[in-house]
Amino acid sequence: MGAQSKYAQQLNNERSLAPFIPFRSQVGPTTVITRDGDFVRTWRIAGLAFETQDKEKLLIRKDQLNTLFRAIASNNVALWSHNVRRRTWDHLKSFFSNPFCDALDKKYYGSFSGYRMMSNELYLTVIYRPVPAKISRLFNVAVHRSHAEILQEQQLAIRKLDEIGNQIETSLRRYGGDDGRGIEVLSTYEDKHGALCSQQLEFYNFLLSGEWQKVRVPSCPLDEYLGTGWVYAGTETIEIRTANATRYARGIDFKDYANHTEPGILNGLMYSDYEYVITQSFSFMTKRDGKEFLTRQKQRLQNTEDGSASQIMEMDIAIDQLGRGDFVMGEYHYSLLVFAEDMETVRHNTSHAMNILQDNGFLATVIATATDAAFYAQLPCNWRYRPRVAGLTSLNFAGLSCFHNFRAGKRDGNPWGQALTLLKTPSGQPAYLNFHYSKGDEDNFDKKLLGNTRIIGQSGAGKTVLMNFCLAQAQKYLHNAPMGMCNVFFDKDQGAKGTILAIGGKYLAIRNGEPTGFNPFQMEPTAGNILFLEKLVQVLVSRDGQHVTTTDESRISHAIRTVMRMRPELRRLSTVLQNVTEGSDRQDRENSVAKRLAKWCFDDGTGKRGTFWWVLDCPQDQIDFNTHSNYGFDGTDFLDNADVRTPISMYLLHRMELAIDGRRFIYWMDEAWKWVDDEAFSEFANNKQLTIRKQNGLGVFATQMPSSLLNSKVASALVQQVATEIYLPNPKADYHEYTDGFKVTNEEFDIIRSMSEESRMFLVKQGHHSMICRLELNGFDDELAILSGSSDNNELLDQVIAEVGDDPSVWLPVFQERRKARIASSKSTGR
């Protein structure tokens, strides 16, 4: 070699990798055969999301895994499992026509720069050994066999491997999402050039080189083909060189084991910020060999007087359990190879990993003897290179290799395309947030699936920011939407005002006594709209418990149909009043429709304004979903006004219903319980929760008062008809509200209560699976001034827009400048 490593003196010279590679050829799409005639197959396992799983369920899964191992146990069978933690990177594709959304998106994904995004990948390899004993192998090789006999034996072995594989796939398919696709066999495939490639060989090559790359199925022996790097082994350190990089690795194994191996005992490593490969192998013993091993262990304890009476008794119990078939015995080995780009970092990472292992009761040590052997023992079938082989029960193995992983959500193939956004997690695993819940690797694009989402979070936990951030990110779904997209936000305390206006939307704060900007009679004069107007006016004239007669209905209908034939600028409630005929007798006139309707009109017929004219009798209607695709309505005032709440709700919901026409549609409700307290909204929410998915829409509901939501008129619909649940930290969470009301598990409830309110973490749940995510917006002061919806910023925003207009590209810079000046002035005053 020309260039010498900085540490070349302490590293051995280069050696060919071929002697250390046991594989000979690929004999089928999913099967590799070794030089010794063993048949090898590997699966990728999604893994069991352990972070939010109840401990009892994890123990059940461990027992089920032990049952699987017992079912496939034979001295012809061995297992290799791998946990690969590696650095990854991702960025969701987004296109925003709105400058605020575009800038927020770019800055948000820019904040991932320097962030250690990691992924954990789990693999299980099964080896079927037709002739497991070494002497038998030599005898088998010595016997001359015809090509037909060899082929027949190979087919028999593959069939046996198929049987074992079917058992494994049946048992482990639940180790992933709800779709039963938790396991996937590594197979051959054709690349775009038509060349046959192998995922299985790519994995084995990764174990040798540390790099993922396409590997074609060769015609030459695999041991001469695999391995695209150079491996140098020193006393404690291995250097791996490839054409792209040089990396260093150090190995760790166990000198002694923890007393108990509950499932997930090694999970602490999965939160580390460095790359590693954990390799574990388990070669099944016969029952006789297993019993002999345990008996020898018992005798050793007795002879050396190292064992206590309880330890000897435990050995007796183990021998009895083995005899009953509670577990099987096997030869086990463990190695952890930690990687880094330089020697100093790999030492630091190794020290960190050892501390984690020792904290869990293992006596871990750096591999200093035959370090290359530990490296090559990563490859399945390399029995002779395994360091520190120990006898272990299948129950212990099920605890050590329990296939735990993190939930990640679904990146692609969602009903509206890619995931809504990418979130950070405690483990570094990328988490993909979606409204819709769609299963596994299915391509559900344009499918009408349930997407209703519920957000629960107490004041100060970040609920408003999260909702507004999701609203801004959802604007990307407008791009390439065949029929467009619309968002309607039913707000409380104007929390979404800044965001709605910044994304180019229209925001109407409905205040008691002030014109709402609503004029229902300027809608298109369609049959459906006219029927709605008739119903609306009937509600107006019956608000005081007044009865609407058949004659009243006829007069209302006549007046409305007359007005709706006029030009739009003439159509309004006052004009309807002018066209309502009164009765002939005095009693009828005193309680006429006209007199009851007058209080809702700008002109009550005598030149005076009615008490509630400001509600629905404005000269120009301000709602037009053709000019704005985002609307916000603040209900803080009117939701507590029983006189006007229902008519306003009816009109808002009718206009929204007209916009639900197949375009992508989201309606948002902050403090949803307050909105659905009105009869019109409760009826709408109850129906729409069930049907809106068929219309390509969804609802997002939020509250900081779970009890109010659970006690609402439509609680069952708001709880049951939900695809995605988001729970922000709440140290005061009520157990019964969350577990009985929202059906979170005990473990999920504990997480919700224990998360720090300042952590910006939250729990996302879809189906029976959940994950812990974090929306990190450090350094986003300008954006948070919009997303947080604070009262002082809203007041400033109103002032700026009144001066410079409602174009976000104009008012946003002025708003930020004045906001910062206000903060600076406040600081100087406080000094």
Swiss-Prot record:
The name this protein carries in UniProt is: Type IV secretion system protein virB4
Q: Which InterPro entries match?
A: CagE_TrbE_VirB, CagE_TrbE_VirB_cntrl_dom, P-loop_NTPase, P-loop_TraG, T4SS_component
Q: Provide the family line.
A: Belongs to the TrbE/VirB4 family.
Keywords for this entry? ATP-binding, Nucleotide-binding, Virulence
This molecule's function is given as:
The virB operon is essential for intracellular survival and is not involved in the invasion process. Constitutes a major determinant of virulence in mice.
Q: Which gene does this sequence derive from?
A: virB4
Miscellaneous comment in the UniProt entry for this protein:
Transcription is turned on at the beginning of the stationary phase of vegetative growth.
Stored PANTHER family: TYPE IV SECRETION SYSTEM PROTEIN CAGE, UNCHARACTERIZED PROTEIN YJGR-RELATED
